[in-house]
């Protein structure tokens, strides 16, 4: 089954997937969630929420230098959002499914958004964590324009869509 592409703006950027979430989204979500909960990804997530406290790129560089265990955990953690940003931005995973999931993107983006922007500027590499940045910015738009409390979005008396 071919998944319809996201609607595009004038610059060819995806705006919104032009379809309802489906079983493929559910299966992909389950794989993402499983990855998020296991192995190094789980260790990296725990480290991030318990220990990551950099507030600027320079601070991150000094506290978690390249080659350190902490930098590895940060890369593992951000890698989850980077790979899912690819899927969501290309319409391969419906944004409603990803953004409604318990991945704490709002908390993550609040902590790493400014650092990623500084990182891109400092290195002259706008592609560094670009999908994390896209996902964080898109989440904000999605939350402001599409999110509703679950009981309003899918009333219990009506059941699933």
Question: Residue locations for each model-derived region?
Answer:
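Acidic, Ser/Pro/Thr-rich low-complexity regulatory regions
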Residues: 2-161
